């Protein structure tokens, strides 16, 4: 089984940032595994513009953004694919500063995916980027650990 960690390639692509003063944005960031669908109100995310020449020259042609851990934003075409393939995900509209059609991908529920016996083992896995998984993830296309 191949397991992939979703994160953004910040060295090559632009990305979206959330407004941390926006209550709705903070609620998504403070994920507890619950559904956010009922009562969802789209919040605004800002395209990172950059300050240096290198940052300003980052590629803006991307279909997903995951700058902040746990906040995955996907473009409409990718949202369509995910909605057909994945049962435990909500695709919730967000407002982008550059008027692109993006959604917040809320993975509903948390599972004990990582196999470790103590905090030290968990820290070693994090440092080495070599993870041991429980069998509970065998049939899941996308999941979020309870940590």
Task: Cite the ranges covered by each PLM segment.
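Phosphate/anion-contacting hairpin/loop surfaces
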Residues: 1-147
């Amino acid at each position: 089984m191949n397991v992939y960690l979703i994160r953004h390639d910040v060295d090559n692509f632009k990305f979206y940032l959330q407004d941390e003063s926006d209550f709705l944005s903070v609620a998504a960031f403070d994920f507890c595994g619950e559904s956010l669908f009922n009562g969802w109100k789209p919040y605004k995310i800002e395209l990172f513009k950059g300050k240096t020449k290198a940052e300003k020259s980052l590629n803006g042609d991307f279909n997903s953004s995951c700058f902040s851990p746990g906040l995955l934003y996907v473009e409409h075409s990718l949202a369509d694919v995910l909605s057909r393939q994945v049962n435990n995900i909500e695709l919730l509209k967000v407002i982008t500063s550059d008027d692109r059609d993006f959604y917040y991908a809320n993975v509903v529920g948390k599972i004990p995916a990582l196999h470790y016996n103590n905090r030290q083992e968990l820290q070693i896995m994090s440092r080495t980027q070599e993870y041991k998984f429980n069998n509970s993830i065998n049939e899941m296309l996308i999941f979020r650990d309870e940590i």
